[in-house]
């Protein structure tokens, strides 16, 4: 359900705006999207896992807040993120 350190480093590397960038909203959205994808696959086999489902909803809410922040700051970055991570809006 959690992502491995290697996968997280790979996601950070592909989403970073500059070297050493781990905290920008784009990187945070990328990491959250990866975790959400993993949890979604988990729920295909464990349909009654409501405890983890609550965690998924919290991750989605956090990602939504970050996306709203990016949209408020720069619409082009927002649209690029939606396209890159296949996020519905």
Swiss-Prot record:
GO biological process: translation
Matching CDD domains: Ribosomal_S15p_S13e
Composition bias type Basic and acidic residues, residue spans: 1-11
Cellular-component GO terms for this entry: cytosolic small ribosomal subunit
Transmembrane segments: none
PROSITE patterns according to UniProt: RIBOSOMAL_S15
Pfam families reported for this sequence: Ribosomal_S15 (PF00312)
Keywords: Ribonucleoprotein, Ribosomal protein, RNA-binding, rRNA-binding
UniProt GO molecular function: rRNA binding; structural constituent of ribosome
Family note: Belongs to the universal ribosomal protein uS15 family.
Quaternary structure and partners: Part of the 30S ribosomal subunit. Forms a bridge to the 50S subunit in the 70S ribosome, contacting the 23S rRNA.
Protein's name according to its UniProt entry: Small ribosomal subunit protein uS15
Organism: Rhodopseudomonas palustris (strain ATCC BAA-98 / CGA009)
């Amino acid at each position: 359900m959690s992502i491995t350190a290697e996968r997280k480093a790979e996601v950070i590397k592909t989403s970073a705006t500059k070297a050493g960038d781990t905290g920008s909203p784009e990187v945070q959205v990328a990491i959250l999207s990866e975790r959400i994808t993993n949890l979604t696959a988990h729920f295909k086999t464990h349909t009654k896992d409501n405890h983890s489902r609550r965690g998924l909803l919290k991750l989605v809410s956090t990602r939504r807040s970050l996306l709203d922040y990016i949209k408020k700051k720069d619409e082009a970055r927002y649209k690029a993120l939606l396209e890159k991570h296949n996020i519905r809006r």
